[in-house]
């Protein structure tokens, strides 16, 4: 129980302490406007990170998600701008394509027994290359539906405006929590991440589960690509470069073990929030380079990976400790 909950508790503690520090330096952090801006600015990252959580929980990795964002953007820009397709038709079309691509990668990973790192790396290069073939330049997306979605928001007390993008990200997190803890699929993901051999012995179809895991990951990455295209009002082949690393960082900082089997979607939300908090603090400060965000995230990653290793060793030692037999003399 401690092994499963301690990383999440530490992540929440880091976020609370970080927010309180930001509040002492800049009282404006108490405004709901700032909180809503953090949600909007990191909506696409939060959506991707939920999918990445399931991948890492299973003991895998998905390096293709950044390229999925790029492909989604240029595909939408092309079919909406050049072919006149309505976004209401283009969105489900590209979502189906994204899910199919993830299912194909999941099938290759299980059938060929090739590490997910290699398969998804190939997927990353493939989709990035296809994105460049579509267009090397940024393609603006001019459509009334895009204008409506980008400005859609609800006023909340304190002057904040909760955007549709931020609300969608929170909805994805809630659905992710439900999938992870209240469905057979979620249980299978945890079992496979804990011990794939045991999962097979228990009769769990690792192939079916692996396919669904990567389908979910790329499906959410495609959804994030739609959100990103609405946020930027454009499609660009260079979009999403390095986002896969930001997503992995959010998941790890959120308390999910890289070895798989332990972690929560809620922790990932706080991992994304910590990154957003650091970026916002740097923007408020005005004197620090934006690269300090990467430095701070790097330091946090070192700390959390060390924590993960310590917890894993402690758990293994407790599991392998000898059992002392007590002989009771019978009279």
Language model features: what each stretch is:
Residues 14-30, 58, 131-135, 177-184, ...:
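Structural signal for alpha-helical transmembrane segments and their membrane-water exit/capping regions
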Residues 3, 112, 116-182, 209-211, ...:
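Transmembrane helix-bundle core of multi-pass membrane transporters
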Residues 86-94, 100-105, 109, 157-235:
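Helix-loop-helix "hairpin" substructures at the membrane interface of multi-pass membrane proteins
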Residues 1-3, 58-61, 80, 99-142, ...:
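Short loop segments and helix-boundary regions at transmembrane helix junctions
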Residues 42-51, 67, 71, 100-103, ...:
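Hydrophobic alpha-helical segments embedded in the membrane of multi-pass proteins
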Residues 1-16, 20, 194, 201-208, ...:
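Cytosolic-side transmembrane-helix boundaries in multi-pass membrane proteins
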Residues 221, 231-298:
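Transmembrane alpha-helical segments in multi-pass inner-membrane proteins
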Residues 19-83, 107-113, 251-265, 299:
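Single transmembrane alpha-helix segments in multi-pass membrane proteins
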